[in-house]
């Protein structure tokens, strides 16, 4: 059940009203269970991939993630979205990561503005991020690397916990201007979440 048209199917989901419920999966079986329950899209999260392989997200290689993506997309027909972490390095590394992961049949991926190697200090409420300018370059390289126009590049900012809501919004808009089509960010509370939803650009 090869998912050769994952990006196109994801685009169709985006046209529907309401939210897309992309359940988190960590292997082909969990993805197939979701599909059997009527879920329309699944998401391979970095933490889930690390735990599912008993490796830990910061230690996973691009090769290991690409292999996991291949197995998952081969097991289901629904679109698969993937957490590509920091893109495995500098902008050129991001470009290669996008090319390798796109070949697996996934619908798209998101890259984040944390440093590489990633620290994953979520439990300490600390995020180590690169400059906005460096992340903008990564987004541009990611967009340039994709071969399928339907393939979705999402930008993610993790800076709100340490740099504040306003900086997160500034970065999100910068990533959109750099070519990202979607944004993932993490407001610190419900009030910030409401502000985020109320903004047209983010």
Language model feature labels by segment:
Residues 2-199:
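Alpha/beta enzyme core
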């Amino acid at each position: 059940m090869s998912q050769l048209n994952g990006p196109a199917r994801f685009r169709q989901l985006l046209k529907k009203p309401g939210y897309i419920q992309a359940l988190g999966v960590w292997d082909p079986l969990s993805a197939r269970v979701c599909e059997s329950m009527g879920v329309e899209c699944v998401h391979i999260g970095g933490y889930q991939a690390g735990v599912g392989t008993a490796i830990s997200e910061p230690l996973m290689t691009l090769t290991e993630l690409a292999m996991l993506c291949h197995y998952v997309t081969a097991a289901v027909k629904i679109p698969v979205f993937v957490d590509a972490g920091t893109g495995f390095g500098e902008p050129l590394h991001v470009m290669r990561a996008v090319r390798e992961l796109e070949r697996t049949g996934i619908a798209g991926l998101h890259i984040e503005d944390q440093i590489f190697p990633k620290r994953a200090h979520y439990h300490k409420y600390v995020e180590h991020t690169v400059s906005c300018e460096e992340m903008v370059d990564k987004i541009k390289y990611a967009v340039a690397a994709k071969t399928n126009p339907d393939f979705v590049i999402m930008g993610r900012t993790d800076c709100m916990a340490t740099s504040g809501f306003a900086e997160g919004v500034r970065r999100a808009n910068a990533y959109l201007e750099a070519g990202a089509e979607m944004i993932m960010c993490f407001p610190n509370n419900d009030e910030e979440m409401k502000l985020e939803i109320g903004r047209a650009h983010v």
